[in-house]
Amino acid sequence: MFRAIAIIRAHEVIDAVPASHIVLERDERHLRRKAITLENGEKILADFAEPVVLEHGDRLVLDDGREIEIRAASEELYEIRGRDPRHIAELAWHIGNRHLAAQIETDHIFILRDHVIRVMLEGLGATVTDVVAIFSPLRGAYSGGHQHHHGHDHDHGHHGHDHDHHHPDHE
């Protein structure tokens, strides 16, 4: 089984035709070590030192030099629109406050479908439409793959009250 040993980001791809491709949903595009079956039926092993997030158009470089194109799957999403840019920002805040993955554009937001969230957003005045599209949400503050050390606990005001919590992964 050939191994994927490097990534070429979509904006760095030169016009070479890929040897094959694979279609992956958002959750499947976040990986570190995983066997993957390509569209041509061949199996490869993605084998990276750290977790990576693959985006539509990225290429995996195999240990034999071939390039495999990543294609983002179309997924069932909500397209959320607000009255104006400020309203969209408020809606984005509510979505982020619930720790939901979101693709935020200038005039709309995409999220994975969830009926409870739809009711909440409509209650906040949003127009919510069912769509099927590629989902490329923003990566969170902790998804950069770097390590940092705090050496202390945090006090956070959250949900109208203060509470302490400790980050054992940062020690």
From Swiss-Prot:
Primary location class: cytoplasm
Protein name: Urease accessory protein UreE 1
Disulfide bond annotation, renumbered to this chain: none
Gene from which this protein is expressed: ureE1
Domain of life where this protein originates: Bacteria
GO molecular function, one term: nickel cation binding
Region described as Disordered: spans on this chain: 143-171
Gene3D superfamilies for the chain: Urease metallochaperone UreE, N-terminal domain, UreE, C-terminal domain
Alphabetical list of InterPro entries matching this protein: UreE, UreE_C_dom, UreE_N, UreE_N_sf
Keywords in alphabetical order: Chaperone, Cytoplasm, Nickel, Nickel insertion, Virulence
NCBIfam families per record: PRK13261.2-6
Keyword Metal-binding: no
Pfam families reported in the protein's UniProt record: UreE_C (PF05194), UreE_N (PF02814)
Residue ranges with Basic and acidic residues bias: 152-171
The UniProt record lists the keyword Zinc: no
SUPFAM superfamilies assigned to the protein according to its UniProt record, in alphabetical order: Urease metallochaperone UreE, C-terminal domain (SSF69737), Urease metallochaperone UreE, N-terminal domain (SSF69287)
Compartments (UniProt record): Cytoplasm
Family: Belongs to the UreE family.
Stated role: Involved in urease metallocenter assembly. Binds nickel. Probably functions as a nickel donor during metallocenter assembly.
Matching SMART domains: UreE_N (SM00988)
GO CC list: cytoplasm
GO term, biological process aspect, one: urea metabolic process
